């Protein structure tokens, strides 16, 4: 009887652990509109590039940006970003995309939520620390 009870309790705790782990993973997803993403992620990364000549964060962010584009514009966003990264001018990608897509994006997609890629979630804090140095 005690063995069954201990096994049942053990199984309960293991199940509880799985549930908590799944909940933690679900909470690690962050959604925001593209404008807020640019303010929170891209703008500080550009500042880090301008002040410290560190393009690492900006490049990593820009590589993910085409995935956030409307389906029919993904290829063009990627083409613009790849062209600027190829010549070492990541800071010029924003202006290029804004010139071409900003009006339409604001009109049709402004409130659309995008998922922030998990590998970028810690970037704002990391960039802030690097800017302090």
Protein language model regions, located:
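Short Cys/His-rich local motifs and their 1-3 flanking residues in nucleic-acid-associated proteins
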Residues: 99
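Positively charged n-region of N-terminal signal peptides that target proteins for export
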Residues: 1-5
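Extracytoplasmic c-type cytochrome modules immediately beyond a signal peptide or single-pass transmembrane anchor
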Residues: 18-93, 102-133
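Short, cysteine/histidine-rich loop/knuckle motifs that typically chelate Zn2+
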Residues: 96
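Bacterial N-terminal signal peptides
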Residues: 8-15
């Amino acid at each position: 009887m005690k063995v069954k009870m201990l096994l049942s309790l053990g199984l309960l705790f293991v199940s509880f652990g799985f549930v908590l782990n799944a909940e933690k993973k679900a909470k690690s997803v962050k959604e925001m509109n593209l404008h807020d993403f640019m303010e929170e992620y891209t703008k500080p990364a550009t500042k880090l590039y301008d002040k410290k000549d560190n393009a690492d964060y900006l490049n990593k962010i820009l590589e993910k940006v085409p995935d956030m584009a409307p389906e029919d514009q993904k290829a063009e966003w990627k083409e613009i970003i790849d062209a600027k990264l190829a010549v070492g001018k990541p800071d010029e990608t924003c202006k290029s995309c804004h010139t071409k897509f900003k009006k339409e994006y604001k009109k049709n997609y402004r409130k659309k939520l995008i998922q922030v890629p998990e590998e970028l979630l810690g970037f704002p804090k990391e960039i802030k620390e690097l800017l302090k140095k």
